[in-house]
């Protein structure tokens, strides 16, 4: 039960962070409070950091909000492709 509550809190913090209500540092401080400075806490903080760096909302090669494609159309006129969590203009996935 405690693991489910921790996961729910973590997902809630990620949702709030994506709305720009909180910044990465405050979420990582909450993780330290709730989970602690252990292996699981470090993993959770790494996920938060990776998602916070994600400027164009690319998740697992999927352009969730079409912001990658929109950015590339404005910048270079090419189609935008998500490579993991990175947006690349005019470079389709090769696998």
Swiss-Prot record:
Domain BetaSPN-type CS-alpha/beta: 55-95
Pfam family name, one: Scorpion_toxin_alpha-beta
Gene Ontology cellular component list: extracellular region
Annotated keywords: Antibiotic, Antimicrobial, Disulfide bond, Fungicide, Secreted, Signal, Toxin
GO biological process annotation, one example: defense response to bacterium
Signal peptide bounds: 1-19
Compartment(s) where it occurs, according to its Swiss-Prot or TrEMBL record: Secreted
Family stated for the protein in its record: Belongs to the long chain scorpion toxin family. Class 3 subfamily.
Name of protein: Opiscorpine-4
């Amino acid at each position: 039960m405690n693991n489910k509550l921790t996961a729910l809190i973590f997902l809630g913090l990620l949702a709030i962070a994506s709305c720009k209500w909180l910044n990465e540092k405050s979420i990582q401080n909450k993780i330290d409070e709730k989970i602690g400075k252990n292996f699981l806490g470090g993993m959770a903080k790494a996920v938060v950091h990776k998602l916070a760096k994600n400027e164009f909302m690319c998740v697992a090669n999927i352009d969730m909000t079409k912001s990658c494609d929109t950015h590339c159309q404005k910048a270079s006129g090419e189609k935008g492709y998500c490579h993991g969590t990175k947006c690349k203009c005019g470079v389709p996935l090769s696998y």
